[in-house]
Amino acid sequence: MENAVKLVGREIFEVLYSPVKAFKKIIEKPDLKGVLLVLLLVIASTVVFQFVYNSKQLYENRAPEDDGWTESLTNSHIWVSNGLPSLDGADYKMGNSDGNHSVASSVLNETSIWLKVTDFDSINCSGEKGYNELLFWISWTNEAETLPSSGTLKLFSGSEDSYFESDITDLSSSGEWTNTTLKVGADQVWASTNSADWQKITGIEFNLVWSDSANLTMKVDGLFFRNYVSPIESLGFSAAMLYLLVSAAFSVAMNWILWACIVIIVAKLFGEDLGKWNVLFIIIGHAFMVTAVYTLVSAWAFSSLPVVSLPLDYDLQIAVLNAMWLPNLAYQVGTLILWAGEVWITALSAVVIRLMRNTTWGKAATIAAVAFGVRFVLRLFIG
């Protein structure tokens, strides 16, 4: 038994450095144990690759997940003001599938205007897993066309007597929308009152003050907390590894089956019968041993890529990846290795066709090349 295992192991690794000799043995005596071992190695290497690849990407995570805070005055939150809060469907900034409103309030002949949202689920802005940014659009108008003398943003913690405070006096100009991102958390410079806790943020207040009375309006849109997390962190390590394992097993099995089917069909078109399909599946499966090698090498190259923070919008994700990764040598090398590996499998398949049918090397290479072309086209549609 031990000798048989060693023999199987020697044959599958021999595919890498002496493919003609290895496939002669495999064709003479196809062994299911060998191809299963190959597939296990490929699955393991694919899990490693996917782990490295996913650990280099952080995805935007929001609270709330949509634009819900500025699409209704009361839901899982409440808007209040020194004026009358309302939804403005004509002047807003987000304009996404979740809604197209801003929250607005106006006062007459006053020196200040404030808007605050409270009674939402507690937001954690502390530690590595907490949210570390607050984003919002804000717009104000003063009919006297004067600038505010002061502006503050408060983050309430449990009650309105306990809060963090930041200055927002210079964030915007009259009648113009300003997109603002404020860093939040214990390592940021916020004034704290009454033992406010970053783990428990329960309300937000915008307040602008002028020296003289005037008719004032304030509007807020796109209000949410944000951080960036990797898919692995989001799922949890155990769940993420299980997902990667299942995903890798499915991907490897589908690639194996699809490639074998393409080779069989293309060979028939060229007048070559490769015999029983189940036998060919076992033989051609040994060629995937190279996948375990080039996948690990590519994972090593990708391990030096910079971590990228990706927004929710898919088009913006592609733009970020193109800007951060495409010019990177590690990405170029890693991608080139992946394609070189596909060509390597094609070359090994040509060896299999040549040995099984005793056809010319030219015809075997042509069949394998056409199969590669078919697989390439299919990848454009099904991945």
Stretch-by-stretch model annotation:
Residues 205-214:
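Short beta-strand-plus-loop segments that form exposed binding edges in beta-rich domains
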Residues 276-383:
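Hydrophobic alpha-helical transmembrane segments and adjacent short intramembrane/lumenal linkers
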